[in-house]
Swiss-Prot record:
Pfam families associated with the record: PTS-HPr, PTS_EIIA_2
Induction: Part of the fruBKA (fru) operon, which is induced in the presence of fructose via the FruR (Cra) regulatory protein. Transcription is repressed by FruR in the absence of fructose. CRP activates expression of the fru operon in the absence of glucose. The two regulators can work independently to control the expression of the operon depending on carbon source availability.
Residue ranges of domain HPr in the record: 310-400
Taxonomic source organism: Vibrio cholerae serotype O1 (strain ATCC 39315 / El Tor Inaba N16961)
GO cellular component, one term: cytoplasm
Catalytic residue positions: 62, 324
General function of this protein: The phosphoenolpyruvate-dependent sugar phosphotransferase system (sugar PTS), a major carbohydrate active transport system, catalyzes the phosphorylation of incoming sugar substrates concomitantly with their translocation across the cell membrane. The enzyme II FruAB PTS system is involved in fructose transport.
Source taxonomy: Bacteria, Pseudomonadati, Pseudomonadota, Gammaproteobacteria, Vibrionales
Protein name as it appears in the record: Multiphosphoryl transfer protein
Amino acid sequence: MLELTTQDIQLQQHFANKQAAIQGLAHALTAKGLVAEGYAQGMLNREAQHSTYLGNGIAIPHGTTDTRELVKQTGVTAMHFPQGLDWGDGNLVYVAIGIAAKSDEHLGILKQLTRVLSADGVEQALQQAKTAQQIIAIIKGEAQLTADFDASLIQLQFPASDMVQMSAVAGGLLKNTGCAENEFVADLVTKAPTHLGRGLWLVASDRAVKRTGMSIVTTANHCEYEQQAVKALIAFSVCNDVHQPLLNTITQCVFEQKQDQLLQADVQQLLNLFSGNAEQTIAQRTIAVGTITEETIAAETVAEPDSARAHTATFRIKNSHGLHARPGAMLVAEAKKFESNIRVSNLDGDGQVVNAKSLMKVIALGVKHNHQLQFTAEGPDAEAALQALGVAINAGLGEG
């Protein structure tokens, strides 16, 4: 059976319009010896008759019955358009598969496509794919498109008395649902959780992870960690980026100081809270398929800036309690207003450089009163971003 392989896919393609893209696909089919000259016109004629857009960011340009004699051998070629290509009627295509069909051997690929056309998150995953292997996995339905989170990953009012117990239970839930193995649980209990405010904590690990998932554990007992209240722990097992929609919900709760909404929710309310944000995020095309390392857990990663084009600014934090959840969220919200890649380091800390648009990473910098933050921005609005961040910091990040 004919199958799409990694050798068939051309990444990072850019065309002015779909007609130019179709001609590019026809040229690739010709170069592979699959079709004779003139097949491109047949593909264009077919597109003029009826759009070959299937849905979920996928199109399948092919010839007409009149051009079948130009097909030397049944085969395919594919192109990836990370910026999206207008295919008409408001449809954006991220992967176009050019088909040269001499018989019905190509039906296997079409059968694969029908399985992903109705799946949530496919279009966003194709947009964000970085490798041919990722695209193949998406088309075959093998890629994880959403993080695992259901009632089996929620444990409310567990009688825990310390953070080790909380981490063990949270890790156990992820292990028992097939997201991770025993080594993950052992690693999780050694991690130092991040306090998100009002007794809500977060911890994550990518050790021995099979699927990305999230668990939530609340405690029925009085519990403290580093002299701060512990009411709930959110744990992530991470092997790709599909947990980002869940992190967006958490970030929004912290930014709006609505941790209590999460802490007081029952199982169904928690499921509704996180599924609602996932749907919104899908609509905004933020789901990504990729890998994540231990150093980038719970953070959106950005490329290292080019020092020749980057802009740098240093600001001193005036907040008496440093960057805890509220001012930290305000800082991240300001950074997210800009397109530029923005990284930040605490010059009075360990000097680690992190993504300024990730609340978890910013809080983890341990910024205290009078610490200096150095921001590096690269992009079309880099100078404006640094200026706005300076204004926000000098204004107290919502704390006056």
